[in-house]
Amino acid sequence: MTLAAAPEAATNDPLFAGLFDRNITSIPSTVEKQRYMTSIAPVAANPGRWIEQPRLPIPVGEHAVIECTGKIHVIAGYARHRVDGGFHQVYDPKSKSWSQKAAFPLPCNHVAGVSIGPKIYTFGGFIEQNRCPHSKCFVYDSTSDTWQPIAGLARPRGAISAIVLDGKIHLLGGRDVRSVEWHEIYDPAADKYTILGGMRGSTGTQPFVGQRDHMGVAVVDGKIHAVAGRMDSYDFNTGLNAVYDPKTDGWTFRAPLPTPRSGVSAVFIGGKIVVFGGEATGRVFGTNEAYDPKTDTWEALTPMTIPRHGLHGATAAVVGNMVHVPGGGPLPGGSVQGAYHDAFTFS
């Protein structure tokens, strides 16, 4: 299926916008009471820094962010007072400019996405606000600016955490009507899924099923770290750092995230897993913490300039030595989304 390019973004989109309230064009005053910037972890010798980048043309939240061939694709999400956005905004770090590409085929939110070579693969999402999960999945070819359907999920859900390992795509957790522990692998070459055993949620002496959504994922030395997230709502956040080894098809547990939260993003850069942003009851996090897999320890990094969430999974894009974080919500829930775009670097 070939789709026309998304309509050009309006030039008067504000830095922040309300999901249903068109009068919101800036961060509400209540945000100051909800910001949480600190960490109990020791401060890193090199805490890194944030650098402001050109803003998104359209404020967005609960979206997917994927690096593909050196460009940053921001796909779907809440925007322009709707929860069913088919937006596709692309940032070129070389020209420092945004453009609009072919619209996402099924407007929705909480979609998961990854890239392999010049193609982007997306999985699931919600049609309504955190409700009505769908099973549809798509592939985008950046060379032709076209979307095509691929095999759908056997179990519809949104807020999945997706990550590439050895040319295949692992889909972890998510939510249908409640959080789930599901783990499956999508093979792009065969267009097929393999369903694995559920995620683990605790230690061997205290096992329970590991239902989680809105968590961060990263690959280190051929293993997948699934960090933070929540069970059912942000009233039940966790700092769990569970590690999946594909060689044994088993889970182990490492030092937990010092600041439990959900709606985070995680990336592996500079030899560390960096986890930033997130939400909890009455809080939005600017907290930025890094995990060293060699020492099994955490340390505190420079907090985000504007705390926000809606970054679930690997919703950040690493280009060179910079982690780009476009969009996100500055208040818990989906009431406000942002056009803010900054990048973190250890340099």
Name each model feature, range by range.
Residues 13-347:
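Kelch-like beta-propeller repeat domains
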Residues 1-4:
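N-terminal export leaders
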